[in-house]
């Protein structure tokens, strides 16, 4: 039997293009968070 490509496969699905360069990192190192924003960040990380 000949292997056929499935119709539902989308080309490039395994490429991480949507994440872009440096995904997940803050590029601006001088970004200063207030104490309240730091607490919020900790809460968000535990929920993910």
Curated annotation (Swiss-Prot):
Keywords: Sporulation. Its main location: other. Induction: Expressed only in the forespore compartment of sporulating cells. GO terms for biological process: asexual sporulation; sporulation resulting in formation of a cellular spore. It is found in: Spore core. Residues 1-23 are annotated as: Disordered. Pfam families: SspO. Transmembrane segments: none annotated. It comes from the Bacteria. Belongs to the SspO family. NCBIfam families: spore_sspO (TIGR02864). HAMAP family: SspO (MF_00665). This is Small, acid-soluble spore protein O. It comes from Bacillus velezensis (strain DSM 23117 / BGSC 10A6 / LMG 26770 / FZB42) (Bacillus amyloliquefaciens subsp. plantarum).
């Amino acid at each position: 039997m000949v292997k056929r490509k499935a119709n539902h496969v989308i080309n490039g699905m395994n490429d991480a293009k949507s994440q872009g360069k440096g995904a997940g990192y803050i590029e601006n190192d001088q970004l200063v968070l207030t104490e309240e924003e730091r607490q919020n960040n900790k809460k968000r990380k535990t929920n993910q």
